[in-house]
Regions:
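Membrane-anchoring alpha-helices and their flanking helix-loop junctions
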Residues: 1-112, 118, 136-195
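Histidine-centered phosphotransfer motif of kinases
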Residues: 119, 123-131
């Protein structure tokens, strides 16, 4: 088995683990009452972009090897680094989900008895779940030795983040007021101490 195949298997295992983490929270979210809903076309466009760049395109590549013309030689160090980054992303994804609990939703929504979470990873960044997606996209770029698939994940994440984050923060400001403004002043959006 070659290094490229190991990278593909690691990516596939990571995606399976991601869904195993997400599924129980998805089920729970469906049972929780929504008080305010900010779904929009741009929200769905961001979700679709992330889904395409971080799941559909790489799954197609793993299954078919297409686009083969964008392949480059796989390196063991890159696959190991990609697995570490993807594993870190999964850990952060799980912790973020657990901290949010019933407050989480796949679209921009405020739940009944919604509370502001500002501990755990939320003490460092306002959007650790987006940070986990960013890390998954970076991990994908190292695991799958294909320029199109690597860039596809990063572009898919960037579209999701930049189409949603401002709207999400406006919604949180409207719901939590000064408490969220104070939280914004002491935390960064995505990368601790940087951005």
């Amino acid at each position: 088995m070659g290094v490229a195949s190991i990278g593909k298997i690691m990516w596939l295992l990571g995606i399976i683990a991601w869904y195993a983490i997400r599924y129980p929270f998805e089920r729970r979210a469906r049972r929780s009452r929504v008080v305010s809903n900010r779904r929009s076309r741009s929200d769905f466009a961001g979700l679709a972009s992330a889904l395409f760049g971080m799941a559909v395109l790489p799954a197609f590549y793993v299954a078919s090897g297409i686009p083969e013309s964008a392949d480059y030689p796989a390196r063991l160090w890159a696959v190991i680094l990609g697995a570490i980054i993807f594993g870190t992303a999964l850990w952060l994804f799980r912790v973020s989900h657990k901290m949010l609990g019933r407050n989480w939703s796949i679209t921009l929504e405020i739940r009944e008895q919604h509370r502001l979470v500002s501990s755990g990873p939320y003490a460092l960044v306002r959007h650790p779940m987006y940070t986990s997606f960013f890390l998954m996209a970076v991990g994908q770029a190292f695991l799958l030795s294909n320029w199109a698939v690597g860039l596809g994940g990063l572009i898919g994440f960037a579209l999701l983040f930049f189409l949603r984050v401002d709207k999400e923060e406006r919604m949180m400001l409207e719901n939590f007021g000064p408490e969220y403004r104070d939280y914004m002043e002491r935390t960064k959006r995505l990368i601790p101490y940087i951005y």
